[in-house]
Regions:
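A generic structural micro-environment signature
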Residues: 7, 20, 77-80, 111-112, ...
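Well-ordered beta-strand positions enriched in small/hydrophobic/aromatic, beta-favoring residues
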Residues: 9, 97-98, 122, 132
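A conserved helix-loop-strand patch within extracytoplasmic ligand-binding domains
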Residues: 120-143
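Short, low-complexity disordered leader/linker segments with a strong preference
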Residues: 1-34
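N-terminal (or domain-start) structured segment
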Residues: 22-118
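Generic detector of low-complexity/intrinsically disordered segments
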Residues: 3, 7, 16, 107-108, ...
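Residue-level marker of positions within ordered structural domains that often coincide
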Residues: 14, 91, 137
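Surface-exposed loop/turn and secondary-structure junction residues enriched for glycine/proline
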Residues: 17, 84, 108-113, 122-125, ...
Length: 143
């Protein structure tokens, strides 16, 4: 369980699609059409910005074979609508990514039958460090 918690506490990019794509010739996946990337957090939030930035880097570094990455935000049901869509996708599953963050864990585990086992972790894109800041006008320098 600790391994699962550590994995989901990091902002992770997950995908379904465990093979079977016609694009696989030598065991490596090479996209030949647009990639859909689902973000279950609100537009403009940290996960959304991070998802779009990583997508921009993947495009700039030609890691997606010149294909377009389309980010879609599905926040309904605390993100469960988007997570469930990706988890149960049959068609074009190789072209669907999902940003999963630590805020997605508890609603998923407490309220649904959907579990991390329904996804395949492709990359851990960041590990959050918790930082505490104070404003410049604060009376004290430290706690």
């Amino acid at each position: 369980m600790a391994t699962v918690l550590a994995g989901v506490m990091a902002v992770s990019m997950l995908a379904t699609g465990c093979g079977g794509s016609k694009d696989i010739k030598d065991g490596k996946f090479t996209p030949s059409k647009s990639i859909q990337w689902m973000c279950t957090s609100s537009a403009g939030g940290g996960s959304d910005i991070f998802t779009r930035k990583i997508g921009d880097i993947m495009t700039a570094e030609n890691l997606v074979n010149g294909q377009t990455i389309v980010v879609t935000n599905k926040t309904d049901g605390a993100g469960e609508v988007g997570r469930n869509e990706v988890a149960t996708m049959k068609n074009n599953a190789d072209y669907q990514l999902l940003t999963f963050n630590s805020g997605d864990l508890m609603p998923m585990v407490q309220n649904t039958k959907n579990r991390a086992a329904n996804f395949r972790i492709l990359a851990i894109m960041a590990v959050d460090k918790q930082l505490l800041f104070k404003g410049q006008g604060a009376k004290y320098d430290k706690f």
